[in-house]
Amino acid sequence: MIINNLEEIKDKFFFAIIIGSGPAGISTALGLEEKKIESLIIEAGELNYTSKNTPYLKGTYVGDPDYSTLAGSRGRQFGGTGNLWGGNCNPIQEEEFENWPIKKIDLDKYIGRAKKILNLKNKFVLEKFNNNLDLYNRDWSDVKFGNKYFNHFKKSKYINLSLNTIYQGSDGDNGKITSINCFKKKNYKLKSKYFILSCGGIENSRLLLWTKNNNPKLFKYDLPIGNYYMDHPFHRVAEGLVNYKKLQSYNKKNNVKNAPLITCDSTYNLSCNKDFIKAKKIINSGLYIGFENANKYDSIFKQVRCMAPNFVKKIYEDKTVKDTYKVKVNILQEQEPLFSRKITLNKNSDPLGIPLPEAHWWKTELERKSARVITEEIVKFFLKNDIARIGIEEYLFNRDEYDTQAGYHQLGGTRMGSNTKDSVVDKNLKVHGTSNLFINGSSVFRTGSYNHPTYTIVKLALRLSNHLAKI
């Protein structure tokens, strides 16, 4: 049901009020709906994005210049960034949950429902590629959350949606929220049994920090709100030439069953296994090896000839140009969770007086080292097996500044855990020391992984809805 006027519900007591209508908020409401439990979603934006919302999305980055804006990476509309994302999905692997208060099996029971929400059709695979690297795949979702779910919400008996409704703080003390303050043409107080903050990786920290500043009596502990902020830096690490027929031969000989046919999927996805990560003292990443058609006049042949003349000579002599492809190796990096990388409140405010966020973010030398070690591993493997010759970018071997593209996977800030010193929410996503405040979305990730987050966000949201239905 669409709520156009809050006068209709100002005296109603809901089971759950969900603040934010991105993938996390929508998935939680859908999970509650399955159990015939009523919820209210309040969304600060409209059905579609309008420029008048841009001042609310502004903020600043402190640190590396790669990430110069916050407004372009967030969405204030029904569906949130679920209308902006690229659709890539893959799961966090079992060993990556090592420091989380939950395990992979705790989310596996929600695989079917998450795939339905995201329209995912393919099976996720992870298999050994060589002694140190694993091959994995990504599935692609065509879902734009606003488009897919607005009519569903409009007809629902259990999901209420109020657009243009801005959260302005919480009433209560001693860990219990009694009502939240909202603005929709005028101020309202809305009541519920449970309150779920689902506003995205940066906005969750921003609103929770602001709530704490305005109502410190609500919180029992001095929680690290905003700390351990992470992203997924994406950058080019190498390029060269590969003999695809030899790569196929290696896969067949070594029983690599799920390697993609480049006529269907032009990218190999590789990551490190846990033994290699531990031995090299690095953090993991996803290597994207992209194949492109090549011809003998491409400049890449001249570049590779300089470092591997015999390899190129053999291509011409054996007339295997048709089997030779250009490869560009990109990396999507996990970041170590650091207390000093954080979301704070800026001195500037949005049009309603709520402080804008400030993201303190930078790349570390451990991340450079990790990118170098992982890239060297695949380059050495290709050389040893005479499959390819690939040159590595120089910046991985020195301390020069280097650019990365924004991953726009804003992670951490309200991370989960059992210790109030290094986490904000518990294993059930309840804020430590509170009885009815929960947080949902990528901000609860304890570590960043190298995987795209939305699939895990949806599973966590479904798990939260199941938990709320039981307590």
Located regions from the model:
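Extreme N-terminal leader/targeting segments of oxidoreductases
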Residues: M1-A16, E34-K35, K470
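Glycine-rich loop(s) and the adjacent beta-strand/alpha-helix scaffold that form part
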Residues: E34, L47, F183-N254, G441, ...
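Short, solvent-exposed loop/turn and secondary-structure capping segments
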Residues: T50-N53, T81, G87, S205-T211
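FAD cofactor-binding and catalytic pocket of flavoenzymes
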Residues: T60-Y61, D222-M230, F234-P355, Q410, ...
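Redox-cofactor-proximal catalytic regions of oxidoreductases
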Residues: K58-V125, F339-K347
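A glycine-rich dinucleotide-binding beta-alpha-beta segment and adjacent secondary-structure elements
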Residues: S162-D173, T324-Q335, S340, L352-T447, ...
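N-terminal Rossmann-like FAD-binding beta1-loop-alpha1 element of flavoenzymes
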Residues: F14-I41
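Conserved redox-cofactor binding core of oxidoreductases
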Residues: I102-S179, E401-A406
